Amino acid sequence: MPSFLLFGVFPFLVFLQRKQYVMKNILTDIRLFLILTVLLVSAHCFSQSVATSNTEMSGIKFRKCSYEFSSNEFSKKIDFTLPLPSENAVLQTICDALLMGEYDNSTLEQDLKNELSSYISDKKEDAVKADDYNETSWSIAPVFVGGGYIAFVSSFSQKFASEEAPAPMWGDKCAVFSLTTGKRISEDEIFDKVAEHNYIVARKMYSTLCKILKKEDDGDSVDVSFLFNDNFYFTAKELIYKYGSFEMYHTSGVTELSLPKKWLKPYLNVDGPLYKYWFGEKK
Protein backbone atom coordinates (compact mmCIF):
# COMPACT_ATOMS: atom_id res chain seq x y z
CA MET A 1 0.00 0.00 0.00
CA PRO A 2 1.42 3.44 -0.93
CA SER A 3 2.67 5.37 2.04
CA PHE A 4 0.63 8.48 1.21
CA LEU A 5 -2.54 6.38 1.74
CA LEU A 6 -1.28 5.10 5.04
CA PHE A 7 -0.22 8.50 6.38
CA GLY A 8 -2.71 10.73 4.52
CA VAL A 9 -6.08 9.17 3.71
CA PHE A 10 -6.48 6.92 6.77
CA PRO A 11 -5.90 9.71 9.31
CA PHE A 12 -8.31 11.88 7.37
CA LEU A 13 -10.98 9.16 7.46
CA VAL A 14 -10.46 8.72 11.19
CA PHE A 15 -10.79 12.49 11.63
CA LEU A 16 -14.05 12.50 9.66
CA GLN A 17 -15.41 9.61 11.69
CA ARG A 18 -14.59 11.34 14.97
CA LYS A 19 -16.08 14.58 13.71
CA GLN A 20 -19.30 12.82 12.74
CA TYR A 21 -19.41 11.18 16.18
CA VAL A 22 -18.95 14.55 17.91
CA MET A 23 -21.57 16.21 15.68
CA LYS A 24 -24.00 13.38 16.37
CA ASN A 25 -23.55 13.85 20.13
CA ILE A 26 -24.01 17.60 19.78
CA LEU A 27 -27.23 17.13 17.81
CA THR A 28 -28.45 14.64 20.41
CA ASP A 29 -27.70 17.11 23.20
CA ILE A 30 -29.51 19.86 21.30
CA ARG A 31 -32.56 17.65 20.83
CA LEU A 32 -32.58 16.75 24.53
CA PHE A 33 -32.27 20.41 25.45
CA LEU A 34 -35.19 21.35 23.20
CA ILE A 35 -37.34 18.53 24.58
CA LEU A 36 -36.61 19.57 28.17
CA THR A 37 -37.33 23.20 27.32
CA VAL A 38 -40.69 22.29 25.81
CA LEU A 39 -41.56 20.17 28.86
CA LEU A 40 -40.61 22.93 31.27
CA VAL A 41 -42.54 25.55 29.34
CA SER A 42 -45.54 23.23 29.12
CA ALA A 43 -45.41 22.54 32.85
CA HIS A 44 -45.21 26.26 33.58
CA CYS A 45 -48.11 27.02 31.28
CA PHE A 46 -50.17 24.23 32.83
CA SER A 47 -49.47 25.48 36.35
CA GLN A 48 -50.54 28.95 35.25
CA SER A 49 -53.85 27.83 33.75
CA VAL A 50 -57.29 26.85 35.02
CA ALA A 51 -57.57 23.07 35.31
CA THR A 52 -61.01 21.54 34.81
CA SER A 53 -62.49 18.06 35.09
CA ASN A 54 -65.95 16.54 35.39
CA THR A 55 -67.20 13.97 37.86
CA GLU A 56 -70.49 12.53 39.09
CA MET A 57 -71.88 11.89 42.56
CA SER A 58 -75.21 10.18 43.22
CA GLY A 59 -76.55 11.13 39.80
CA ILE A 60 -75.47 14.78 39.96
CA LYS A 61 -72.79 15.93 37.54
CA PHE A 62 -70.08 18.20 38.89
CA ARG A 63 -67.34 20.28 37.34
CA LYS A 64 -64.05 20.90 39.13
CA CYS A 65 -62.25 24.19 38.38
CA SER A 66 -58.94 25.05 40.03
CA TYR A 67 -55.84 27.19 39.71
CA GLU A 68 -52.83 28.29 41.73
CA PHE A 69 -51.01 31.59 41.38
CA SER A 70 -48.01 32.96 43.23
CA SER A 71 -46.07 36.21 43.02
CA ASN A 72 -43.96 38.36 45.32
CA GLU A 73 -47.14 40.18 46.35
CA PHE A 74 -49.52 37.34 47.12
CA SER A 75 -50.48 33.75 46.40
CA LYS A 76 -53.94 32.44 45.71
CA LYS A 77 -55.41 28.97 45.32
CA ILE A 78 -58.91 28.24 44.05
CA ASP A 79 -60.46 24.76 43.95
CA PHE A 80 -64.21 24.56 43.30
CA THR A 81 -66.26 21.42 42.66
CA LEU A 82 -69.80 22.51 41.84
CA PRO A 83 -72.80 21.16 39.94
CA LEU A 84 -72.52 21.68 36.20
CA PRO A 85 -74.44 24.73 34.95
CA SER A 86 -77.86 23.58 33.78
CA GLU A 87 -81.47 24.61 33.52
CA ASN A 88 -82.03 23.25 37.03
CA ALA A 89 -82.87 26.42 38.93
CA VAL A 90 -82.48 24.71 42.32
CA LEU A 91 -78.85 23.73 41.70
CA GLN A 92 -78.14 27.23 40.40
CA THR A 93 -79.59 28.71 43.59
CA ILE A 94 -77.36 26.42 45.66
CA CYS A 95 -74.26 27.43 43.68
CA ASP A 96 -75.11 31.12 44.08
CA ALA A 97 -75.28 30.66 47.85
CA LEU A 98 -71.93 28.84 47.94
CA LEU A 99 -70.11 31.38 45.74
CA MET A 100 -71.53 34.31 47.78
CA GLY A 101 -71.59 36.67 44.80
CA GLU A 102 -67.85 36.37 44.20
CA TYR A 103 -68.31 34.30 41.03
CA ASP A 104 -71.10 33.11 38.72
CA ASN A 105 -71.28 29.34 38.30
CA SER A 106 -72.66 29.65 34.75
CA THR A 107 -69.46 31.46 33.64
CA LEU A 108 -67.13 30.16 36.35
CA GLU A 109 -64.43 28.64 34.14
CA GLN A 110 -64.08 31.76 31.99
CA ASP A 111 -64.23 34.05 35.03
CA LEU A 112 -61.36 32.16 36.66
CA LYS A 113 -59.35 32.25 33.42
CA ASN A 114 -59.83 36.02 33.18
CA GLU A 115 -58.86 36.45 36.82
CA LEU A 116 -55.71 34.35 36.45
CA SER A 117 -54.73 36.13 33.21
CA SER A 118 -54.95 39.49 34.95
CA TYR A 119 -52.73 38.23 37.78
CA ILE A 120 -50.15 36.90 35.32
CA SER A 121 -50.06 40.11 33.28
CA ASP A 122 -49.50 42.20 36.42
CA LYS A 123 -46.97 39.83 37.96
CA LYS A 124 -43.69 41.42 39.06
CA GLU A 125 -40.45 39.46 38.89
CA ASP A 126 -39.08 40.89 42.14
CA ALA A 127 -38.06 37.90 44.27
CA VAL A 128 -38.42 39.83 47.54
CA LYS A 129 -41.85 39.36 49.07
CA ALA A 130 -43.91 42.49 49.64
CA ASP A 131 -44.49 43.72 53.20
CA ASP A 132 -48.20 42.97 52.88
CA TYR A 133 -47.65 39.55 51.25
CA ASN A 134 -50.52 37.19 51.96
CA GLU A 135 -51.66 33.70 51.04
CA THR A 136 -55.30 32.83 50.45
CA SER A 137 -56.98 29.55 49.65
CA TRP A 138 -60.63 28.81 48.93
CA SER A 139 -62.11 25.42 48.10
CA ILE A 140 -65.67 24.16 47.80
CA ALA A 141 -66.56 20.48 47.52
CA PRO A 142 -69.59 18.24 47.99
CA VAL A 143 -69.34 15.87 50.96
CA PHE A 144 -72.72 14.15 50.85
CA VAL A 145 -75.66 13.61 48.51
CA GLY A 146 -78.66 11.57 49.61
CA GLY A 147 -82.26 11.60 50.80
CA GLY A 148 -83.05 14.68 48.74
CA TYR A 149 -80.21 16.70 50.30
CA ILE A 150 -76.76 17.82 49.25
CA ALA A 151 -74.02 18.98 51.63
CA PHE A 152 -70.94 21.08 50.86
CA VAL A 153 -67.89 22.16 52.81
CA SER A 154 -66.35 25.47 51.83
CA SER A 155 -62.80 25.81 53.20
CA PHE A 156 -61.09 29.19 53.42
CA SER A 157 -57.73 30.29 54.78
CA GLN A 158 -55.76 33.51 54.76
CA LYS A 159 -52.44 34.31 56.38
CA PHE A 160 -50.01 37.21 56.23
CA ALA A 161 -46.22 37.33 56.24
CA SER A 162 -45.99 40.46 58.39
CA GLU A 163 -46.03 40.00 62.16
CA GLU A 164 -48.08 43.20 62.42
CA ALA A 165 -50.79 41.86 60.12
CA PRO A 166 -54.02 40.29 61.38
CA ALA A 167 -53.90 36.76 62.75
CA PRO A 168 -54.43 33.95 60.25
CA MET A 169 -58.04 33.12 59.47
CA TRP A 170 -59.19 29.68 58.44
CA GLY A 171 -62.12 27.37 58.73
CA ASP A 172 -64.66 25.14 57.06
CA LYS A 173 -68.13 26.50 56.38
CA CYS A 174 -70.70 23.73 56.07
CA ALA A 175 -74.06 23.90 54.35
CA VAL A 176 -76.82 21.37 53.69
CA PHE A 177 -79.36 22.20 50.99
CA SER A 178 -82.66 20.70 49.97
CA LEU A 179 -82.50 19.42 46.39
CA THR A 180 -86.21 20.18 46.10
CA THR A 181 -86.22 23.83 47.13
CA GLY A 182 -82.56 24.87 47.19
CA LYS A 183 -83.06 26.13 50.74
CA ARG A 184 -80.28 25.75 53.30
CA ILE A 185 -81.17 23.63 56.34
CA SER A 186 -80.66 25.49 59.63
CA GLU A 187 -79.84 24.29 63.11
CA ASP A 188 -83.21 25.46 64.41
CA GLU A 189 -84.99 23.13 61.99
CA ILE A 190 -83.27 19.91 63.02
CA PHE A 191 -83.46 20.11 66.84
CA ASP A 192 -86.62 20.29 68.91
CA LYS A 193 -87.46 23.36 70.97
CA VAL A 194 -86.97 21.77 74.37
CA ALA A 195 -84.15 23.69 76.10
CA GLU A 196 -83.20 20.69 78.22
CA HIS A 197 -82.78 18.56 75.11
CA ASN A 198 -80.59 21.18 73.46
CA TYR A 199 -78.40 21.25 76.57
CA ILE A 200 -78.09 17.45 76.55
CA VAL A 201 -76.88 17.51 72.94
CA ALA A 202 -74.35 20.29 73.61
CA ARG A 203 -73.20 18.53 76.78
CA LYS A 204 -72.68 15.32 74.81
CA MET A 205 -70.58 17.18 72.25
CA TYR A 206 -68.49 18.70 75.03
CA SER A 207 -67.89 15.25 76.54
CA THR A 208 -66.78 14.06 73.12
CA LEU A 209 -64.44 17.04 72.91
CA CYS A 210 -62.91 16.18 76.29
CA LYS A 211 -62.32 12.59 75.19
CA ILE A 212 -60.54 13.78 72.06
CA LEU A 213 -58.38 16.14 74.13
CA LYS A 214 -57.85 13.46 76.80
CA LYS A 215 -58.80 15.93 79.52
CA GLU A 216 -61.12 15.83 82.49
CA ASP A 217 -64.75 16.43 81.58
CA ASP A 218 -65.57 19.75 83.27
CA GLY A 219 -68.71 20.33 81.22
CA ASP A 220 -70.92 20.85 84.27
CA SER A 221 -69.07 24.11 84.99
CA VAL A 222 -68.78 25.30 81.37
CA ASP A 223 -71.26 27.04 79.10
CA VAL A 224 -71.36 24.32 76.45
CA SER A 225 -73.79 26.16 74.19
CA PHE A 226 -70.86 27.56 72.15
CA LEU A 227 -70.68 24.19 70.40
CA PHE A 228 -73.93 25.05 68.60
CA ASN A 229 -72.65 27.31 65.81
CA ASP A 230 -75.01 26.40 62.92
CA ASN A 231 -71.95 25.14 61.04
CA PHE A 232 -72.87 21.53 60.34
CA TYR A 233 -73.73 18.93 57.77
CA PHE A 234 -75.17 15.44 58.02
CA THR A 235 -74.73 12.12 56.29
CA ALA A 236 -76.78 8.94 56.37
CA LYS A 237 -75.18 7.99 59.70
CA GLU A 238 -74.13 11.09 61.66
CA LEU A 239 -74.31 14.82 62.29
CA ILE A 240 -70.99 16.67 61.96
CA TYR A 241 -70.10 20.09 63.36
CA LYS A 242 -67.08 22.11 62.21
CA TYR A 243 -65.06 24.75 64.09
CA GLY A 244 -62.65 27.35 62.70
CA SER A 245 -59.94 29.76 63.80
CA PHE A 246 -62.33 31.98 65.77
CA GLU A 247 -63.40 29.03 67.92
CA MET A 248 -60.01 27.44 68.55
CA TYR A 249 -59.68 29.01 72.00
CA HIS A 250 -62.77 27.11 73.14
CA THR A 251 -62.13 23.82 71.33
CA SER A 252 -58.36 23.70 71.94
CA GLY A 253 -57.63 23.06 68.28
CA VAL A 254 -60.30 20.43 67.62
CA THR A 255 -61.99 21.25 64.32
CA GLU A 256 -64.70 18.60 64.10
CA LEU A 257 -67.20 16.88 66.37
CA SER A 258 -69.83 14.35 65.38
CA LEU A 259 -72.85 12.67 66.91
CA PRO A 260 -74.35 9.36 65.72
CA LYS A 261 -77.81 9.05 64.24
CA LYS A 262 -79.15 6.60 66.83
CA TRP A 263 -78.10 8.70 69.82
CA LEU A 264 -79.62 11.90 68.41
CA LYS A 265 -83.11 10.54 67.71
CA PRO A 266 -84.81 11.65 71.00
CA TYR A 267 -83.58 15.23 70.58
CA LEU A 268 -84.54 15.93 66.98
CA ASN A 269 -87.51 17.89 65.71
CA VAL A 270 -89.86 15.12 64.54
CA ASP A 271 -91.23 17.45 61.88
CA GLY A 272 -87.78 18.59 60.82
CA PRO A 273 -85.81 17.54 57.74
CA LEU A 274 -83.16 15.49 59.54
CA TYR A 275 -85.61 13.38 61.54
CA LYS A 276 -87.70 12.70 58.44
CA TYR A 277 -84.62 11.79 56.41
CA TRP A 278 -83.21 9.45 59.04
CA PHE A 279 -86.37 7.92 60.52
CA GLY A 280 -89.25 8.84 58.21
CA GLU A 281 -92.55 10.41 59.24
CA LYS A 282 -93.34 9.89 62.92
CA LYS A 283 -96.47 7.79 63.31
Task: Map each language-model feature to its residues.
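Bacterial N-terminal signal peptides that target proteins for export
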Residues: 24-34
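Short hydrophobic targeting helices and cationic amphipathic motifs
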Residues: 5, 13-16
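Low-complexity, intrinsically disordered or signal/transmembrane-proximal segments
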Residues: 17-21
